[in-house]
A protein has these predicted regions:
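Accessory carbohydrate-recognition regions in carbohydrate-active enzymes
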Residues: 23-259
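Bacterial Sec-dependent N-terminal signal peptides
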Residues: 1-24
């Protein structure tokens, strides 16, 4: 009798194991929708994050206000930047540090750097937008495709430009939204593919500091300045109350990786 029970239990266990092996792998992340909470008064953002990670890389709209405390609201149709820090679910806005925006135009030196960067804010449709855990992508109306992902301490940007356009990127260390205020910025061109710097601000924290290193997959020429653009040469450093950058990758390739 004991032998019979042992054999039955063994066959039952083998049967259960076989069933489990035949089951399709269940990907729980397929049920996650990062756009939940980005409309109404949800105050959430749809960008790329990791659990307990130090980077929240997500699109920003060019608006202030209670519904834009996360930087993004689903009712909007303009993206002003992809910045690296965000708050989610809060009723007050802050962060949105180190703003990137791929552009397909050359700089207009007849206007201020701030005005030029604002002129590059891009229209988009939610039909061309996608988000899943750790990943975000969008195609602007001007044809530029952006894909975002993250590691614990690094934001990863992949840009694909129309072949017949400028292949460039603006970096905004100055603009602050809602209750944030920029107090000091610094940028240094280390070499043809590397920048380093910081942004200091006041908001929830009286003295917030974000230090960064930016690496590109292609050589670039850089214009930088607060009130006007000037060439930023290798080894040169600019420190001011604010700074805007225009990074030109030339025409060797229309696919750029930045991190």
């Amino acid at each position: 009798m004991k032998t019979l029970l042992f054999v039955c239990n063994l066959l039952l266990c083998l049967g259960i194991t076989g069933c489990r092996q035949n089951e399709k792998e269940l990907k729980i992340t397929a049920y996650v929708n990062p756009f939940i909470g980005t409309d109404g008064h949800g105050h959430c953002f749809p960008g790329a994050i990791l659990p307990f990670g130090g980077i929240q890389l997500s699109p920003d709209n060019p608006r202030n206000g209670w519904d834009w405390t996360s930087g993004y609201h689903y009712s909007d149709s303009i993206i002003s930047s992809f910045s690296h820090t965000h708050l989610s679910g809060t009723g007050i806005g802050d962060l949105q540090d180190i703003r990137f925006l791929p552009v397909s135009t050359t700089p207009d030196t007849s206007i201020s750097p701030a005005a030029y960067i604002q002129s590059g804010y891009a229209r988009f449709s939610h039909r061309n937008e996608q988000a899943e855990p750790g990943y975000y992508s969008v195609v602007f109306d001007n044809g530029i495709k952006t894909e975002l992902s993250v590691t614990n301490r690094c934001g990863i940007h992949y840009y694909q430009y129309p072949a017949n356009s400028a292949h460039a990127l603006t970096i905004d260390l100055t603009t602050a939204r809602n209750w944030d205020r920029t107090t000091e910025t610094s940028i240094r061109k280390v070499n043809n593919r590397t920048l380093e710097g910081y942004r200091k601000s006041q908001g929830w924290a009286n003295d917030q500091r974000v230090y960064f290193i930016i690496e590109f997959s292609q050589d670039c020429e850089v214009l930088a300045g607060y009130k006007k653009f000037s060439p930023l040469e290798n080894g040169q450093k600019i420190t001011d109350k604010g700074c805007y950058l225009y990074v030109d990758f030339g025409q060797k390739t229309n696919k750029i990786l930045a991190k």
